Every structure is written in structure tokens, then in C-alpha cells.
Amino acid sequence: QLQVGTTFIYITHDQSEALVMSDFVAVMNQGRFEQVDTPQNLYNDPQTPFVARFVGENNAWSGQVVLTEDHLAHIETREGQRFRVRLKQTLPQGTQIDLFLRPEAMLIQPDPGLSTLNRFAVVVKAILFDGANSRLLVNPPQSDRELLIALPQNRQYDHIRVADRIEVGWDLNSGICFKT
């Protein structure tokens, strides 16, 4: 494109290809544009729940706002977990929401000194080894909800085994909430 000086429209169903090759990507849903944006914005700042679910991997919870302070909300999931999350807009108490969180936003055995983290225990269900794309498949105790967590291949987590109970956490700025 840059060498020829021409704009191209390329249609693909391969998300990775679209994100790597494009200056702008259009995400369509049932023949309508959901979001037209840079690959970085589609991934990091989806504007609709459809785009959040469609582009990349996500962990998702449904729940409601139980408390708000400016643009910070306390969310309770349907499973009873409580998280703090930064909102783009203030939502009143009782608002039903969907919360999305990327697997790479979750920290394994986070530093206890990090005060802005949502922390909770999980049980390792599977270790999905795929080199740099490795993941942990985990469940919160007494829950069948499956969560994916990026597993860095820096040897720091080689001790983790299936059935281990570990603590995970994520920064309150990492979650993306949408009113349902």
C-alpha cells in the first residue's frame, strides 16, 4: 500500500491477518458495521459487546453495578464475585452489565503490594501449552465458569500443575464494561 500509494480493501475472516495487515478494520455483524477503527482500538477499546466478544479472546462475566464512585464501579457477578472496574461512563447502582477481560490482562500470583488489583482464587483445570501463546484454563472454586489466563513462557510459572489452587488478579483499568 505505502509503496504503490493506493488504498486497498481486503476482505478476510482471519482476525489475525486483518489486525496485522490493516490501518483500519471494519467489524460487521449481520450486514451492519459494528465498529470501524484501528486494529489497536478494536482490540483495546471495543465500542460494543459484539466487538468485545468477536475480536480476540476474552473472559466474560455478567452481573450488576452494586456501587459507583465517579467512574469507578463495584460489580457483583452472577456467581457472587465482586470486582472493581473503571467505567467509560457512570452507571447507576443496579445496572446490569457484561464485563470483558483479556487473558493477558490477568496476572498469575500477583504482587501483594499492588492495591488496584481484583484478586481471587482459581483452580487450574488445564495447561494449554502453545509456546508464546500458552494459556491456563482455570475455574474459580465451586464454579464451572472457565477462564483463560495467558501463561508467560519465562519459566516463572513452571511449578504450576493441574489441580493447583492459585491466586490471580487484574487491574481495575483492564476490564471493559457494557450496559446490557
Language model feature labels by segment:
Residues 2, 7, 12-81:
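Internal alpha/beta loop-helix hairpins
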Residues 58, 68-180:
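Non-catalytic connector elements of ABC transporters
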